[in-house]
Amino acid sequence: MDDKFDDDALPNSKTTPEDYGDKLAEYDYTNTFPNTWMRLREPFREYIAEFVGVAVLIIFGVGADCQVVLSANTGVAPSPKGDYLSLNCGWAIGTAMGVWISGGISGGHINPAVTLALMAWRGFPWWKVPGFIFAQLLGGIVGAGLVYVNYIHAIDIVEGGRHIRTLDTAGLFATYAADYMTNVSCFFSEFLATAVLIVVIHAMNDKRNAPPPAGLAPLVLFFLILGIGASLGMETGYAINPARDLGPRMLTAMVGYGRQVFAFRNQYWIWCPVIAPFLGAQVGTIFYDLFFYKGQDNVFGRLGSHIHISPA
């Protein structure tokens, strides 16, 4: 049986600088460094890129949440500054900009669920995973902290004082499901949205499918996140990214909201915005690999590949 897997199929998770249209620098960063700083920073560039990418994602996304919701209070603004579409645009732009910044350096994961799926199914080095996830989580905390400082006075007005913090404004930073949703329904919603996310990401990176032209991956992600928010976002706030929820949630716990942000619905935070995206990304990847992917790193494509059937 002939091998139908081509060498030019996408070999792993990391999108190369060439895929983003970057030109090589005048010197090779991997072998020659013009000064000590360039040499010292090299081992950390990928992790810093993930940190900054997630921080930018949160600044745009949580910033949009804060501006739209807080401005609805007449004590903050004379008229509302946006609507649900504004929220979705904020998250879509944040995702696109975060990937634009980090894509040519780290691959632009900016999502622990994506990182883990790429490790399991695309050959992403396992030893990089803890550092990537830590950087992503830290980026979520720092990004949320910057937005909190920016909007602290408006939050004070809405809450009624500096030392009053409730889930009403905690929901600007992390996701809290609608009251009518059961935890099982919330889990399914996050699972489904993340599975859709990862399937499109794999299709976008699959050279045997229909990848976007060089440099346009962030634009595809913009429409992807905008679409997920418009279709699946109302009930849970579509975390679809553990770092997007857990990082800001930890920030709120540190700035005065306390344990209530973790006690909501008996540890809702761990099942729906964390575990569900991780599982959704795994199942979405399995689905894509089973039915579409033809790259050499497709685990299902290698099963039984050593068996050759001779014609009768």
Swiss-Prot record:
Stretches in topological domain Extracellular: 72-89, 150-183, 235-267
Motif (NPA 1): 111-113
Recorded superkingdom: Eukaryota
Motif (NPA 2): 241-243
GO CC list: plasma membrane
InterPro entries found in the cross-reference section: Aquaporin-like, MIP, MIP/Aquaporin, MIP_CS
Cytoplasmic side stretches: 1-50, 111-128, 205-213, 289-312
Keyword field: Glycoprotein, Membrane, Repeat, Transmembrane, Transmembrane helix, Transport
A molecular function (GO) term: glycerol channel activity
SUPFAM superfamilies for the chain: Aquaporin-like
Induction: Highly expressed 15 degrees Celsius. The expression is comparable or even higher below 15 degrees Celsius, but transcript abundances decline at elevated temperatures.
Topology relative to the membrane: Multi-pass membrane protein
Keyword Isomerase belongs to the record: no
Glycosylation sites noted in the Swiss-Prot or TrEMBL record: 183
Record carries keyword 4Fe-4S: no
Compartments in which it is found: Membrane
Protein family (similarity comment): Belongs to the MIP/aquaporin (TC 1.A.8) family.
Physiological role: Water channel required to facilitate the transport of water across membranes. In addition to water, also shows strong glycerol and ammonium transport activities. May be involved in fungal nitrogen (ammonium) support of the plant host in symbiosis. Glycerol accumulation has never been observed in ectomycorrhizal (ECM) fungi, therefore, glycerol permeability of Lacbi1:391485 might be a relict of the affiliation of the protein to the group of aquaglyceroporins, and other osmotic active compounds (e.g. trehalose or mannitol) may have taken over glycerol function in ECM fungi.
Domain notes: Aquaporins contain two tandem repeats each containing three membrane-spanning domains and a pore-forming loop with the signature motif Asn-Pro-Ala (NPA).
Protein name: Aquaporin Lacbi1:391485
Organism: Laccaria bicolor (strain S238N-H82 / ATCC MYA-4686) (Bicoloured deceiver)
